[in-house]
Structure formats: C-alpha cells, structure tokens
Amino acid sequence: MNADPLPSLTKYFKCPDSILNFAVNEHLSTREGFFRLGADTVCYGRCSTERLSKEPGPDLLDASGNVQVNGTGVLLPFDPEEIVRNLRQERYAADCAQYRRNDTIIREFYYLLRPWMPLSFRKHLQRIYLKGWDKLSFPKWPVDRTVDHLLQQLMMLGLRSKGLESIPFIWFWPEGANACAIMTHDVEDNPGKLFCSQLMDLDESFGVPASFQIVPEVRYSVEPEFLEGIRKRGFEINVQDLNHDGRLFQEKATFESRVKKINRYGKEYQAVGFRSAILYRNQEWFDHLDFEYDMSVPSVAHLDPQRGGCCTVMPYFVGGLVELPVTMTQDHTLFNVMGDFTNSLWQQQIQFIHRHNGLMNFIVHPDYILRQQAQDAFKSLLGVLGRMRQEDNLWLALPRDVNRWWRQRDAMTLSFRGSEWCIEGEGSERARLAFASLKEDQLVYSLAEPGNAVHANELNTSGKN
C-alpha cells in the first residue's frame, strides 16, 4: 500500500503531514453516488462498490466495512479529497433531482413583480415555494457539519493506524477561542438603508462588530457619505451582488459581464468580501470574483431558493477565495417564513456550533427588523453573543478579520524543533497549539498552555508499535 498524507485533512487541522498516511482503493466505481461512512456521515462520490444511491436516504450503503487499517496507514474505499470537494462545493446537488428546481420562469415573474408585492403576500408565496423542505434528509437541518465529521473520522482512523494517542495541530481560532461569530447585515432596499444608522447603534450598544453588504445598483443610491458613515464607525463594507435581481448566476455570460462591474465596485467601496443576492451561487465560477472572501454559501439550504449546502461550519478555500459559510438561519426566514420570534432556533444553532468549535455566520437585514417585535428578537440575540464573548470564550469578529486569520493559519507551519512543537508564521503569536486525542471512540480536542511551543512528551505523539 502506497500511503500518503491527505491534503484536506492536514489543511483542515494544520497538523504535521508526515505522521498520518492514507491510500485509496485503485478500483473505484465509474459513477458517483451517495453512500455513508458509519451511521451519520453521508458521502457523495465514487466508491469501491457499485451499490451507490442516486438520492440520499436511510438505506445508504455503509462503506466503513471496507476500510482497512494497519501499521503503515489506512486504505480507504473512496477518495476523501473527492468527497470533501463534492460536499463543500455542492456538486452532489447538481447531480441529484431533489435539489434541482426548474423554476426559471417563476423566479423571473416573482422578481419582476416583487417591488409591488406587500411583504405579507411575499411571505405567503415563499411558504408555498418552500413546501416540503422538512422532508429533505440531507444536508442535516438546522446545521450540517458532514465535512467536519468526515475529517474527524479520518483523523481517528489515522491515529489508530499508527497506534497514536494524540496528534498536535494548530487550533482553529486565535487566542484559543472556543468558536467564532460574525454578524452581517444585507441592505436590500431603501428603508433598510435608512435604518442602518440605528442598526449600528444597536450593534454598538452590545459591543458586536458587523459588516454591511451593499447592493451597488438599482435598489437605492449609494453615496460616498453613506459608505463613509459606516466605515468611520468601525463597521465593515462589502459588496452584495450587483442589482439584487436574482439573475447573477443564471447564465455564465451574464455572470461574466456583471462580475466585472462587481469587482470595480469592490475596489471603489474598499471591500474585500462579497455576497450574492438571495444566496444564489455557483462555486465553480468564484475564481472570477476579485475579492478575498465570499459569504454566499449556506451550510444547509433547505429554506433557501437554491437548495444544497456546503455541509460544514468551518471556513474553507475555494481556489484562492476564503469561503465563510452562512451557518445560521436568516432573520427573514426565521421571522417572516417560519413566524418565529422566540430565538429558540438561533439558540439551538448557537449551542451546536459552539460545541463543535465552528463559525456562526448571521445574516440580519435592516429591512426586516424595522418592526419592534423583530428588533426585540435581534436585541436578545446580541445580548446572547455579548455574554458568550465574556463567559464562553466566543470570538466576535468582523468577517475581514476571520478571513485574515484563516489565511494566516493556513500559511503557518507546525514544526518539531529539538524537543518542542513550534508554530511558525505570520500571526503565530495569536495561535494556540492543540492536540486531537482518541478517547472511547471519540476525537477529543484540548489546548496546550499559551505560547507557541510545547514539549513533545506533553502531547504524547509516540506510537505504540
């Protein structure tokens, strides 16, 4: 077995690439399909068995019985690089009927008449359009972390193959933060634009930083004074689509024409981040975006017009672009589609993502919190985030700061020097050394003491065989 490191695993954990080795069965299926690894991890791609499913469901083949572990490495019945890529970039959705919608005419008609539709009527139409969302089994609702779970399973297999108790890695967040949260405000129409100043007051009153995604054309005028008013208060400005008509990713020619203007607006606005309107997306085209990061891909998209989801609660790279996935239910969906002002769903998602050390990416539109009931729910959310920063070591950051950190972490190295593991590279003074350990068939994380070096015997990476 010719075993090598897994790029997706070492990039995710930022662990030494010389310790764990994996190989892929040479005889994979010719077609891609759904299967699972263990009870809970749905995969999509080729496998060494031909019994793959066209749709996700309860009776998927479990490929874990075909995994071989020995002292030299792990032989896998699938290519994990392919599986991770297919999930993150939503390639499973393009090939699966339950995610596709033949609704171009309906969408065109809706966005043509939308300016004259009252909100109550739009909510009614959206509920009809989204009917059946709760029957979708994959990705998991209300948060999906299939990619993260898959990589954790691979880490466990790798540790077992070498008889290791633990392996060092660079912790996910700076200063040892347990998790990260970003607040983003998509400004859709002029009433929302007019409310931005009051919204900044609310954010500031709870000490929550935020970014404002601005639509450059059609929806409202974008004066330099408006942008400067946001910027000088310490908030971030990003570009949101071009004109918010839902057509950006409809045709490649349309996208290529519009993205040139979008990129120009990015430079004019001094924006390093982008988000598409209504979270329409095609990650295969993201290389045309002249931005450092994107925020257009949901973790799970059952309640979005474009179904699918990237199946992770962690940032990842799409080429040279950092993707900060939308991991929290949008305010519009929560308030206007589900009719929920209790924050119970947000609380459920917050607790889940915090427990799994992930990224909470909120979208709260100024347009949809004009009513007092919605404002009260938003204030409650801000209060929760403020308390978690103080009590639960939550990193509250601007999206651009998360982008910068994720790039710095990706460029860092974990080296063994003398008798110590050392983190090196720009930003390493904020990095924390951690280790992943096998305990009762679970992967458990723990942090080393502050500092960027630790003695090897503290991490117990010596093999048993």
What residue spans do the PLM features occupy?
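Acidic, His- and aromatic-enriched active-site or binding-groove loops in soluble protein domains
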Residues: G234-H244, F291-R307
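Terminal accessory/targeting
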Residues: M1-Q213, E217-V222, E284, H288-L289, ...
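Catalytic cores of extracellular degradative/oxidative enzymes
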Residues: W171, H185-Q283
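Conserved beta-strand positions in the central sheet of alpha/beta enzyme cores
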Residues: N238, R275, D294-M295, N361-I363
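Short, surface-exposed amphipathic charged segments that create phosphate/polyanion-binding patches used
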Residues: K252-E256, C310-T312, R409-R417
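Catalytic pocket-lining loop regions of alpha/beta-barrel enzymes
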Residues: M295-S299, D304-F335
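Acidic/polar loop patches that form or flank catalytic/metal-binding clefts of enzymes
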Residues: V272-G273, Y293-V297, N393-P399
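Short amphipathic alpha-helices and their capping/turn segments at secondary-structure boundaries
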Residues: P224-K232, C311-Y316, Q348-F352
